[in-house]
């Protein structure tokens, strides 16, 4: 089994607002439950560090960016929907692919889907 990828994420927030705190809490819950220690999260307050927001072309908060592994993906706005966050960052697809690749069901399904010349 190959080692799991490490995900590098940046969460851009605007101050210590309820929306920012909710986004951070939801994101940490998702990361702890789904990625257990194989991630690094940097929280950037765009009010304290506007140059970082400008350099990364952040126009709205909260914005979550997946930096690594490529490609870079961003999700802007409400982060309360777990599935939306995972799909938006291409994380759910990786999770499903790894599960399928490790299962015997994939082999069975692939064999059943191959059409024989007789049919």
UniProtKB/Swiss-Prot annotation:
SUPFAM superfamilies: Thioredoxin-like. Component of the KaiBC clock protein complex, which constitutes the main circadian regulator in cyanobacteria; it may modify the ATPase activity of KaiC. May be a metamorphic protein which reversibly switches between an inactive tetrameric fold and a rare, thioredoxin-like monomeric fold (KaiB(fs)). KaiB(fs) binds phospho-KaiC, and perhaps clock output effectors. It comes from the Bacteria. May undergo a major conformational rearrangment; in the free state forms homooligomers. When bound to KaiC switches to a monomeric thioredoxin-fold (KaiB(fs)). The active oscillator complex is probably KaiC(6):KaiB(6). Has 2 forms, fold switches to a thioredoxin-like fold (KaiB(fs)) when bound to KaiC. The kiaA gene has been eliminated from Prochlorococcus during genome streamlining. It has been suggested that the central oscillator in Prochlorococcus does not have to be as robust as in other cyanobacteria because the former live in specific niches of the Earth's oceans; they divide exactly once a day and at the same time. Thus gene loss and changes in kaiB function compared to other cyanobacteria, can occur. The lineage of its organism: Bacteria, Bacillati, Cyanobacteriota, Cyanophyceae, Synechococcales. It comes from Prochlorococcus marinus (strain MIT 9313). Gene3D superfamilies: Glutaredoxin (3.40.30.10). It holds the Pfam family KaiB. This is Circadian clock oscillator protein KaiB. The gene is kaiB. Belongs to the KaiB family.
């Amino acid at each position: 089994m190959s080692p799991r990828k490490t995900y590098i994420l940046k969460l851009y927030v605007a101050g210590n607002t309820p929306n920012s705190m909710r986004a951070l809490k939801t994101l940490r819950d998702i990361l702890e439950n789904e990625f257990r220690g194989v991630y690094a999260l940097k929280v950037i307050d765009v009010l304290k560090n506007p140059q970082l927001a400008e350099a990364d072309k952040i126009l709205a908060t909260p914005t979550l960016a997946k930096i690594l592994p490529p490609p870079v993906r961003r999700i802007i706005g409400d982060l309360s929907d777990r599935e939306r966050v995972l799909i938006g960052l291409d994380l759910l697809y990786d999770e499903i692919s790894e599960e399928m690749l490790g299962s015997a069901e994939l082999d069975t399904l692939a064999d059943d889907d191959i059409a024989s010349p007789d049919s």
